[in-house]
Amino acid sequence: SAKVYRPENIVADMFTHTDSTHANVVCGDFMLHLDAHGGYKRLLRHSDQIVGEVKRQIENKYIDQLKLRSYLPQMCVRLNMGHDNVFTRMMQRKGFDLASAFIDMDTSPIDGINGVVKLDSLIANGVQLDTIRVNLKSDSLRTDFTGQIRNNRHNPQYVFNALFGGTFYERGLYFGTRVLDAKERVGVALGLKASMESNGVMLSVGGRQDPILGYKKFSVNKNNYVLFSDDQRISADIKLRADDGTSVQVYSNDSTEALQDLTLGISNFELSKV
């Protein structure tokens, strides 16, 4: 027999004028509220301007946060979503699932991006993440972010607690993370800095503390780097060494005429502990 589908009630209060856009949408336990200055055409123009400015800054190897911020719309978005609504069921048909979601975000050309994102029991491609939290905070000079991805002891796949944070600054990004196992032991702790250079993008390992990989603390050479050059070459000089002799090295021979000469050296490293 044919299957009968009964659509749920969707209550929507939406309008857009030249000076404002407003939306209230309720469907089951899905609730969305949006208020923005300017009509929808102006909001689309903001989006195009941001994309264009990002491309321009990447091409010119710099990050001008204030310039990017000037294109942000004056907007607030509030989203509360549970498990009993048509939008969650649409996600399920695509192989995703979610117990709940909460977003409280404000954007402004003066104050930047500020807000929080909370997701619970997200399932994507068969992988379950119990808790996801992201916080964004902007001041007059920069934008900071902190967050957490955690699987509790009842997770059927992996139990861990990953904490991360970072900062967008003038010429790049700093990102740091600590990953704890089910026994609250730090298995990985790493700080990475990405910076725009005149000839490419440079990554370096560093932070307030020495990196930890596979539960071992490593020292790292002071001027370490990996440079992804505009000419498609990779240059590197990273030396990680633990007290027990475990070491990881990545280095390049930039004097060769070969398209690429990159060497990875690993000594006494137990990959199963990472």
Show the residue positions of the predicted features.
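Interface amphipathic segments
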Residues: 1-274
